[in-house]
Amino acid sequence: MEFKESTGQLDRSMETLCAFLNCEGGTILYGVKDNGKIIGQEVSDNTKRSIAEAVNRIEPFVELEISYVPILETDKYVIAIHAECQRFMRPFTYKGRAYMRIESTTTFMP
Protein backbone atom coordinates (compact mmCIF):
# COMPACT_ATOMS: atom_id res chain seq x y z
CA MET A 1 0.00 0.00 0.00
CA GLU A 2 1.23 3.45 -0.90
CA PHE A 3 -0.04 6.74 0.57
CA LYS A 4 -0.11 10.00 -1.40
CA GLU A 5 -1.40 13.32 -0.08
CA SER A 6 -2.99 14.24 -3.40
CA THR A 7 -3.18 13.46 -7.09
CA GLY A 8 -0.60 16.23 -7.49
CA GLN A 9 1.77 13.25 -7.13
CA LEU A 10 0.02 11.37 -9.95
CA ASP A 11 2.99 10.72 -12.24
CA ARG A 12 5.16 9.21 -9.50
CA SER A 13 2.27 7.17 -8.14
CA MET A 14 1.52 5.72 -11.60
CA GLU A 15 5.10 4.44 -11.65
CA THR A 16 4.35 2.72 -8.33
CA LEU A 17 1.08 1.34 -9.67
CA CYS A 18 2.98 -0.07 -12.65
CA ALA A 19 5.44 -1.70 -10.22
CA PHE A 20 2.52 -3.20 -8.28
CA LEU A 21 1.25 -4.77 -11.52
CA ASN A 22 4.71 -6.21 -12.20
CA CYS A 23 5.13 -7.61 -8.68
CA GLU A 24 2.58 -8.61 -6.04
CA GLY A 25 -0.20 -6.09 -6.66
CA GLY A 26 -1.16 -3.26 -4.32
CA THR A 27 -3.22 -0.17 -3.63
CA ILE A 28 -2.48 3.55 -3.81
CA LEU A 29 -4.48 5.86 -1.55
CA TYR A 30 -4.65 9.58 -2.37
CA GLY A 31 -5.67 11.92 0.43
CA VAL A 32 -3.57 10.10 3.04
CA LYS A 33 -0.30 11.34 4.56
CA ASP A 34 2.78 9.09 4.78
CA ASN A 35 2.02 8.53 8.47
CA GLY A 36 -1.45 7.18 7.59
CA LYS A 37 -3.41 10.27 8.64
CA ILE A 38 -6.44 10.77 6.38
CA ILE A 39 -6.62 14.32 5.04
CA GLY A 40 -8.71 13.72 1.92
CA GLN A 41 -8.73 15.67 -1.28
CA GLU A 42 -11.34 17.41 -3.36
CA VAL A 43 -12.42 15.49 -6.45
CA SER A 44 -13.48 17.38 -9.56
CA ASP A 45 -14.15 16.27 -13.12
CA ASN A 46 -10.61 17.40 -13.88
CA THR A 47 -9.25 15.12 -11.13
CA LYS A 48 -11.10 12.13 -12.57
CA ARG A 49 -9.95 12.99 -16.09
CA SER A 50 -6.31 13.29 -14.96
CA ILE A 51 -6.49 9.89 -13.27
CA ALA A 52 -8.06 8.28 -16.36
CA GLU A 53 -5.42 9.81 -18.65
CA ALA A 54 -2.59 8.62 -16.39
CA VAL A 55 -4.01 5.09 -16.11
CA ASN A 56 -4.31 4.95 -19.92
CA ARG A 57 -0.53 5.47 -20.17
CA ILE A 58 0.02 2.05 -18.55
CA GLU A 59 0.66 -0.64 -21.16
CA PRO A 60 -0.58 -3.20 -21.88
CA PHE A 61 -4.13 -2.14 -21.02
CA VAL A 62 -5.30 -3.40 -17.65
CA GLU A 63 -8.48 -2.87 -15.67
CA LEU A 64 -7.91 -1.21 -12.32
CA GLU A 65 -10.34 -0.74 -9.47
CA ILE A 66 -10.77 2.99 -8.75
CA SER A 67 -12.87 4.04 -5.74
CA TYR A 68 -13.82 7.46 -4.39
CA VAL A 69 -14.48 7.11 -0.66
CA PRO A 70 -16.19 10.14 0.92
CA ILE A 71 -14.87 11.49 4.20
CA LEU A 72 -17.73 12.15 6.58
CA GLU A 73 -18.69 15.76 7.24
CA THR A 74 -16.36 17.12 4.54
CA ASP A 75 -16.44 17.58 0.79
CA LYS A 76 -13.26 15.54 0.43
CA TYR A 77 -12.51 11.96 -0.57
CA VAL A 78 -9.87 9.30 -0.32
CA ILE A 79 -9.17 7.97 -3.79
CA ALA A 80 -8.14 4.31 -3.92
CA ILE A 81 -6.62 2.67 -6.99
CA HIS A 82 -6.11 -1.07 -6.63
CA ALA A 83 -3.97 -3.21 -8.94
CA GLU A 84 -3.99 -7.00 -8.90
CA CYS A 85 -0.76 -8.73 -9.85
CA GLN A 86 -0.92 -9.65 -13.54
CA ARG A 87 1.54 -12.53 -13.92
CA PHE A 88 0.74 -13.39 -17.54
CA MET A 89 0.80 -9.88 -19.02
CA ARG A 90 4.07 -8.57 -17.59
CA PRO A 91 6.04 -6.42 -17.91
CA PHE A 92 3.80 -3.40 -17.57
CA THR A 93 5.17 0.00 -18.50
CA TYR A 94 4.23 3.57 -17.69
CA LYS A 95 5.27 6.12 -20.32
CA GLY A 96 7.42 3.42 -21.91
CA ARG A 97 9.36 2.41 -18.77
CA ALA A 98 8.90 -0.73 -16.68
CA TYR A 99 9.01 -0.45 -12.87
CA MET A 100 9.37 -2.79 -9.91
CA ARG A 101 9.18 -2.55 -6.11
CA ILE A 102 12.11 -3.24 -3.82
CA GLU A 103 10.83 -3.00 -0.23
CA SER A 104 9.03 0.38 -0.16
CA THR A 105 10.91 1.84 -3.13
CA THR A 106 9.79 2.01 -6.76
CA THR A 107 12.62 1.69 -9.27
CA PHE A 108 13.21 1.03 -12.97
CA MET A 109 13.30 -2.60 -14.08
CA PRO A 110 16.72 -3.60 -15.45
Predicted regions and their residues:
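Conserved N-terminal catalytic/coupling substructures associated with nucleotide/phosphate chemistry
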Residues: 1-110
